[in-house]
Amino acid sequence: HTAIIAGFLISFLGGSRVQIGGPTGAFMIIVYGIVTEFGVNGLILATIMAGIIMILMGLMKMGSVIKYIPYPITTGFTSGIALTIFSSQINDFFGLGIESIPPEFINKWGAYIGAFSNIDFSTTIVGLLALAIILVWPKINKRIPGALIALIVTSAIVSIFNMEVATIGSKFGELSSKLPEMNIPAFDLNQIKMLIPPAFTIAILGSIESLLSAVVSDGMIGSKHRSNMELIAQGVANIASGLFGGIPATGAIARTVANIKNGGRTPVAGMVHAITLLLIMLLFMPLAKMVPLASLAAVLIVVAYNM
């Protein structure tokens, strides 16, 4: 829901031509901490408050400070996100079966090492097949993304041969095919006071991640983003996400890079991305449940490598 609602608004209103917005892995530790302390309602309210802060930051022209961030920081940020994405896919790619993965990087790899004897070879074969298709397909046809072909082919193979590998459906169960109704969360003055620090955390980190993603995309396509407009768009998107029960959204550098690699050059690509997700949710959710998690992991591993 967040990727659909916030993603559309970020592309429609944003200051970057190719930015793809939505929830990101870099935010999951923050989200987890807020939910643990304040509950889901607290997270939703903090997301809305963060959106208001981001709009104010944009109106105050604070997006311009991005030009003072050194290039090594941008490179380090991108590499860090790539490493985070890669490390988050190991469990699904090898079928390790870890139910609860620690969010901390070192602890996460410790859990992987401890569970490596549980590698599921069927899952690994599916992941390797998806990886091979993604790498080879561009030599056959550059118009159709290799990731899409990989997901379709591996989903069909798993279904036809009734392979016992984890899929979106087996992990998440029945997926809702409806958008939630807009709802203003219950709140009081004391709750707002307690949520000011988390809201500022979401706003500051979301702004930095979005603007750094925009800088990276500028370097890839030779464009120049409008940083203050990007902050305003991010703020509007987070308010809308919260009102529909979503989580914080920001510029997603992995999806932005994937967008550029697949030929996206205008905001229309981001809007089509959001509409496509909506259509999948409304029309093809039963088919989406068939997608192997190992195949999704392969797609994200390639995205991380390309970053």
Residue ranges and their predicted role:
Residues 1-307:
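Transmembrane helical cores of multi-pass ion-transport proteins
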